[in-house]
Amino acid sequence: MVGKIGFVSLGCPKALVDSELILTQLSAEGYETAKDYSGADLVVVNTCGFIDSAVEESLSAIGEALAENGKVIVTGCLGARKNADGSDLILSIHPKVLAVTGPHATDEVMQAIHLHLPKPHDPFTDLVPPAGVKLTPKHYAYLKISEGCNHRCTFCIIPSLRGDLVSRPIGEVLLEAKRLFESGVKELLVVSQDTSAYGVDIQYRTGFWDGKPVKTRMFDLVNALNQIAREHQAWVRLHYVYPYPHVDDILPLMAEFSEHGYGVLPYLDIPLQHAHPDVLKRMKRPASGEKNLERILAWREACPDLVIRSTFIAGFPGETEEEFEYLLNFLEEAQIDRAGCFAYSPVEGAKANELDNPVPDAVREERRARFMAKAEDISIKRLAKKIGKRVQVLIDRVDESGGIGRTIGDAPEIDGLVRVLPPTKPSKRYRTGEIIRATVISSQGHDLIAET
């Protein structure tokens, strides 16, 4: 009898990749994935434990799985959280779960599954696609290049949950990228906790790819991904890029995108968090000494098509009105294309909880609202400049009203969309996963309307 596993995946793209690894192993061993709790022999819940709302969502999901199914294995970042007395947080709230593991723990999860639901005798490993099992649509996928983080930002507990930086071998990463492109992926989203630090933990060790030596470092990785993507007429999007000086080296590759139409996109997701030097110092941000505004302006000079996304925190402990106004001015001068903002929320175990002068809740929320109003105004004005221009659009889905997709400046789920009107020729149909060219005819908030 084939064992059926229910699966719940919560949290960030890194956690999603962990879920994909577990599901790939389950498929390789002959297990099936159940569509609902009632049809599952047991349920795996991959949790998030970064901020309080994520903890609540994860605990609620565990409780629901226990109520609906009764047999639950928990993995992910929340699995690494402990109570003040050192006891397991999850087991203290949900003592009936079968097992608890931390993040990136595929082997431990599989051992727990084997214990409570022995694997089928005939695994049919040849039925697993070379690219593995993916939770994203077939035309885009996340590529995790490293695990953990060496930074000790005061608002963050990721290092205590996921450990220090561990870079994957560059040959292994590039092989996975090639297999994903060969499986039909048209957009590869590079993720990690710090993409710019790739290889620093192993002193940029020399690896091998395509029979040639290649350094385990950011530029060499991006350069190779750029070449592979062009060969497969696909895109590569970089996330979690810290603004270190060596990031300058990849801007020429991005500037070439307009000539080829494929390769590494002129898009950088940079987790800046703030702009004022004193706030960055209290946050213990790794780039607090960098002149971020000057660097961003230089990047735009080197690559005029560059789109920058970033996230920020409003109301961090000790933040004054003057420091917040400094952040708003930075946002205006840097012309951040896509910006998100969180009102600071204390995270259990974070060093920031010990800082003086906490900002009142109402002030935090008021500053977040002011930030988002400014960010939206900048984004809308920058999008309006695209009206009348030809853009590439990756089609995410098709309906009776045409196609819905994204430009090179839009990452899935977090940025804007493009509504492409139906083709003028009745015989023409858009296809999910194809990259088309369209003319922007109007903008609506964060989104665009285009026609072919």
UniProtKB/Swiss-Prot annotation:
The record's remark on the cofactor is: Binds 2 [4Fe-4S] clusters. One cluster is coordinated with 3 cysteines and an exchangeable S-adenosyl-L-methionine.
Q: Which GO molecular function terms does the record list? A: 4 iron, 4 sulfur cluster binding; aspartic acid methylthiotransferase activity; metal ion binding; protein methylthiotransferase activity
Give an example GO cellular component term for this record.
cytosol
Q: Which SMART domains match?
A: Elp3
Keyword Iron-sulfur attached: yes
Amino acids binding [4Fe-4S] cluster 1: C12, C48, C77
Q: Which residues form the Radical SAM core domain?
A: 135-381
Per its UniProt record, the required cofactor names are: [4Fe-4S] cluster
Please list the residue ranges annotated as the MTTase N-terminal domain: 3-118
EC numbers on record: 2.8.4.4
List the subcellular locations: Cytoplasm
Keywords tagged on the record: 4Fe-4S, Cytoplasm, Iron, Iron-sulfur, Metal-binding, S-adenosyl-L-methionine, Transferase
What reaction(s) does this enzyme catalyze?
A: L-aspartate(89)-[ribosomal protein uS12]-hydrogen + (sulfur carrier)-SH + AH2 + 2 S-adenosyl-L-methionine = 3-methylsulfanyl-L-aspartate(89)-[ribosomal protein uS12]-hydrogen + (sulfur carrier)-H + 5'-deoxyadenosine + L-methionine + A + S-adenosyl-L-homocysteine + 2 H(+)
What the entry lists under InterPro entries is as follows: Elp3/MiaA/NifB-like_rSAM (IPR006638), Methylthiotransferase (IPR005839), Methylthiotransferase_CS (IPR020612), Methylthiotransferase_N (IPR013848), Methylthiotransferase_N_sf (IPR038135), NA-bd_OB-fold (IPR012340), Ribosomal_uS12_MeSTrfase_RimO (IPR005840), rSAM (IPR007197)
- Regions crossing the membrane: none
TRAM domain residues: 384-452
Q: Which EC main class describes this enzyme?
A: transferase
Set out the biological process GO terms recorded for this chain's protein: tRNA modification
The UniProt annotation places [4Fe-4S] cluster 2 binding at: C149, C153, C156
Q: What is its main location?
A: cytoplasm
Q: Show the Pfam families listed in the entry.
A: Radical_SAM, TRAM_2, UPF0004
State the function annotated in the UniProt record.
Catalyzes the methylthiolation of an aspartic acid residue of ribosomal protein uS12.
- Family statement drawn from the similarity comment of this UniProt entry: Belongs to the methylthiotransferase family. RimO subfamily.
What protein name is recorded for this chain? Ribosomal protein uS12 methylthiotransferase RimO
